[in-house]
Amino acid sequence: MISNIRDLKQHVGETVTLQAWLTDKSGKGKIQFLKLRDGSGFVQATVFKNDVEEEVFESAKRLTQEQALTLTGEVRADERAPGGVELSVRRLSPISENHAEYPITPKEHGIEFLMDQRHLWLRHRRPWAIMRIRDCVQRAIVDFFHSEGFVRFDAPFFTPNAAEGTTELFEIDLFGEDKAYLSQTGQLHAEAGAFAFGKVYTFGPTFRAEKSKTRRHLLEFWMVEPEVAPSNHKQNMDLQERFVSFLVRRALDECTVELEMLGRDLSKLKGAAEGNYPRVTYTEALEIVRQHIENKDLPPNVQEDVQPVEWGDDLGAPHETILGHHFDRPVMIEKYPAAIKAFYMQPDPEDSRVALCDDMIAPEGYGEIIGGSERIHDYDLLKSRIEHEGLPLEAFDWYLDLRRVGSVPHAGFGMGLERVIAWISGIDHIREAIPFPRMLTRMRP
């Protein structure tokens, strides 16, 4: 029976067989050290010349990096070894021969080289750990919404209009007769689903033609977007908090090995796992930022010449970074000026200058991970907002239909998966949070 590396701790003192790839090797004299991976984890194997047939030892010496092999040996406890165990090899045989030299050697490589070799780099410890965390979070997303009674609802990738009223769209020529766009969001269609099922969520790729080279932006990323009808602004924020704290708890429960492999300080995630996220208004957030700037109490990656935000302007990345360092867990900033938010957001009945919306800012400078709002449910108000933004009414006629019949207050939000993965994993750039990033300067491999 073939064992896997992740379960070797359960077989200490037993003889097992592994099928694995060689990531690196070293040795001298009568011993060879083989570093192995099999997709489930990493382990070191030792081949002692006196314990094996001569051909086995010679075969071990001939192995090349990333060669696939089958090994049989005894699992031994060793606190010094990664994972607390190592394999003492008795038999070994290559599964196949390599036909080229593996380009990613154990020496240091620059990030651009590694991204050029992304199809191979995924085999290495760092991306392996990040992708395992991504898988864990994706499963947790589905589990959370299932436990809350949501229906998964698939929105189209082709749309005839810009849901956010922006020009950052990938245009598609439909057989020379009409134009369509790659979807920026599944929200509008999810609202239709909410009126049918009460609670729905979409989860899939999203496309934004942003000519940005920042560490927070991708042209193609994954987004989860729940919509609830009926619902309101406060209930929407409560849902966001339950959701994010659930994801962090799941990652801490299931991915300790991967997080420690990345050198992640797990204590930084404990507050997020507990919930109780602070909630401040946009106006209060501006004051927090202003005080930090005046006192020169700035995070290391924020330049000293950063300027305060004037009321009515959006928060920039440096301001979000300041707020993220001010709190020890995600902070929810609510009631932004309506003029800088999307047309479909419900105005605050107590102050029409602001919308019933919020952004969730991750700590440690990771910035916005969620944007949400109560949606306009009144037909006349929504129509006037569409016209005010200069958007074509005919493109939104079906969306207005949702307000013509059976409209109720409803709310939802969008969460960028890769931003959450970057934050939980503690990585600097969002490009590492997706298997094959698509950016302004990268379309391959």
From Swiss-Prot:
Keywords: Aminoacyl-tRNA synthetase, ATP-binding, Cytoplasm, Ligase, Nucleotide-binding, Protein biosynthesis. PROSITE patterns: AA_TRNA_LIGASE_II. GO terms for cellular component: cytoplasm. One of its GO terms (molecular function) is nucleic acid binding. Its main location: cytoplasm. It catalyses: tRNA(Asn) + L-asparagine + ATP = L-asparaginyl-tRNA(Asn) + AMP + diphosphate + H(+). Pfam families: tRNA-synt_2 (PF00152), tRNA_anti-codon (PF01336). InterPro entries: Aa-tRNA-synt_II (IPR004364), aa-tRNA-synth_II (IPR006195), aa-tRNA-synth_II/BPL/LPL (IPR045864), Asn-tRNA-ligase (IPR004522), Asp/Asn-tRNA-synth_IIb (IPR002312), NA-bd_OB-fold (IPR012340), NA-bd_OB_tRNA (IPR004365). It is found in: Cytoplasm. Its EC number is 6.1.1.22. One of its GO terms (biological process) is asparaginyl-tRNA aminoacylation. The keyword Ligase applies. Homodimer. Belongs to the class-II aminoacyl-tRNA synthetase family. This is Asparagine--tRNA ligase.
